[in-house]
Amino acid sequence: MEQQSENVYFSGSESESLSDSESRAQPQNQNSDNSRSASLTPPDSSDLEDYVDSDSETSSSLVNAPKRIKIIRSPSTSNWPRRLTSDDNGSDDDSEDEDESNDEQDLVESEEEDQRSRSSSRSAMDISSEEDSGDDEPSFTLTELPGDVPDFKVYNRNIAIFSIKYLNQFGRLNAGIQETDFPTAKLVNTNRHVVVWINMLENDTTPVTPDSFDSFNLSGAIILKDSSGLIEYMYVHKNSRTVKSLLLDAIATIYNQVTGNDILINIWTQNINIDEDVRFLVNYGFVEPAIVGKNTIQMKYHPKIPHQQTLNEIRRLLGYSKRNVGWINVFLPKDLAIKLFSYVNNYDVEFGGYLPLTSVQKPNGAWVLGWDDTLVSKGESLSVYIPPPQEHQKLEETIIGFHTHPIALSSSNTISDGMVILPPSNIDLKGISNQWLFPRPNIAHFICSPEGLWVVSLTEEFQSLLMGLRDLGEVAWPCINMILFVIFESMFQQHDQKFNYPTVTPITKWFELTDVQDLIKNLTLKRCFNYLNIPMEKFEATCQTISGYQNVRLYDISYNKWESFSALPDEGLYFTFYYKYDDFTGYPRQKSLTTEASN
């Protein structure tokens, strides 16, 4: 996506180096009518000398990077987990509980893919075995005791459940959990159980016993507090939906049915994957969300309550928990998804424009997105021009933007197998970000590709940074230029090194879909500067506005298969987007653009 004076261009499937794209825009008076231009010219080599050491290779590579990229990456296992659960238990009175928790990785789609990843690479829990030197050998109870949770039990062949007091008997699992952010003090507390996914090949007949348990590869675990039924920790390697469901099935069967107690889970609201995670948990049967502590929403397992009712309540709670931030709930129906996919599948050029909010609202207050031919522009094979919002256009017509990545842009060897990947490019992110320097930016932008629908938006923190620089006027343009340059140049180079698939296979497609989301979700200014070997301290001295923003995430992104529009009861998908409001952007100073949704 490339932006000019009063123009917004969206690029095609290939990422492009900012240093190779011509800048057609120069800073203009921000008060000029319909002005959406920005000086996005990358700093030249003389400018970079202010920030790059003379012996660094970055100063030349930044301005001479190739325009066309080749992306290559070998599948590898991720590090030990970052979790979706929160330790802030509300009524739970464990003194060692902490508020801080990391985020869980993106969810994957099938058990078959998860088995491929496990068989082709070491599990994230596959840590060197350690001998236990304890003198007392515990005795394991392999039968259920009435009204009690068993000390050790194998459930559904691939899952083991045992008391945490025996954790030190399993060196590999113990070492793996020790490397996480789970509070060590809780590991010696005996009123907890561990539920673990065991990697077993289909033809493996080795029985799972306390003696053989630690010889298996392990790639999923839940830590459950017995007294309250609270899931304190949850992780699945590559976050397979199937494995997560099986782990929860085991808890529902062994804990809920045996003890009769409720199962609770705490969600950390700062989790970068919260939309995907809560959707999974709600679909599984977790309901009745309530705020129980700082940045913590608690849900209870109760599969009979309608899923959508719970999702709507979570969105409402999340919206009210954010300060000086408005939000909007939208619904993209199946018929609109079919229309968008037809532009991906049937044309060899890009289309782009806006998806207006219709006058129709769902019972929960979400606005239904529609289609207006007058808001859609036809582009070229690798770009599309989207006119900026005009004064005569209503606000609800231009809140949500979109553009297509047609299947024709992909190479012929992938089209024949249906293995097409055209994710958001660094130039797409450039244009989406640049809009926040001008009135009425897109609150969210949909990128329609053969593999599915990508949804990109700026985090509230990145919105605040750009809006603050915008308010400083022309004096801030060099700072803005440098920020955008390092973000998109680092994106370009990381794509170049990580995501090149000459022939896309189901396995490489799955890895790229996961890794693209991971890369974009975890972008921060500090990581971008470090990746390009540019000392951030020198830049911060001349651009003090970025102080406090070095480690904030820049983007939110989600990926949705086209098939998912038919899989849900409403035959469509709900989205919630958050925005910083002020007079310049034109968005209202109210807590929600959808009145009913905020009640």
Curated annotation (Swiss-Prot):
Source superkingdom: Viruses
Disulfide pattern: none
Composition skew (Low complexity), residue ranges: 11-20, 118-127
Bias (Polar residues) ranges: 1-10, 24-44
Region (Disordered): 1-146
Biased composition (Acidic residues): 46-56, 89-114, 128-138
Family listed: Belongs to the IIV-6 229L family.
Protein name: Uncharacterized protein 229L
